[in-house]
């Protein structure tokens, strides 16, 4: 009987430890939002550079990898480059922005989902999904975007 009690206690202790480890490794999610203001053509014709405000405040850029379009629709395949004010980097998956022309050279962002797949510092192991709205002015090279979404930090940190 004493052996069975010891085994039961050992199994219970192992379960408690596993639950504690799992809880420590769980992600803590918080909302994120702000604005991006960039200039297209800052480096070359396909690259923007600018600033991010809000929860992910810092410097931001994007490279247009390719485009496709039919009628008034212009689709941009984009790779983002982002460094927060504290020096952490954000690693985003390539994104697709679907826009529609609202005036000559002026495009409204219809859908623009972006997926965070990690980064450095507090963003190491973080994930998140962000949606964007805004405008691209190909006449002046100005891009303005409003972003909103959720960031889930690894280990419950943020």
Where are these regions (language model features)?
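Beta-strand-enriched cores of mature, soluble protein domains
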Residues: 25-158
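Glycine-centered signal
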Residues: 3, 19-23
């Amino acid at each position: 009987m004493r052996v069975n009690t010891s085994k039961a206690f050992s199994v219970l202790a192992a379960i408690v430890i596993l639950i504690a480890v799992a809880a420590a490794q769980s992600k803590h999610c918080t909302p994120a939002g702000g604005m991006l203001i960039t200039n297209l053509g800052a480096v070359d014709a396909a690259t923007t550079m600018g600033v991010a405000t809000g929860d992910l405040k810092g410097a931001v850029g994007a490279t247009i990898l390719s485009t496709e379009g039919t009628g008034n629709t212009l689709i941009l395949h984009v790779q983002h480059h982002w460094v927060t004010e504290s020096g952490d980097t954000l690693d985003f998956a390539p994104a697709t922005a679907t826009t529609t022309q609202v005036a000559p050279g002026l495009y409204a962002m219809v859908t623009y989902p972006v997926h965070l797949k990690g980064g450095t510092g507090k963003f190491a192991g973080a994930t998140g999904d962000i949606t964007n709205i805004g405008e691209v002015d190909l006449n002046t090279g100005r891009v303005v975007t409003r972003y909103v979404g959720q960031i889930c930090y690894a280990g419950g940190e943020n």
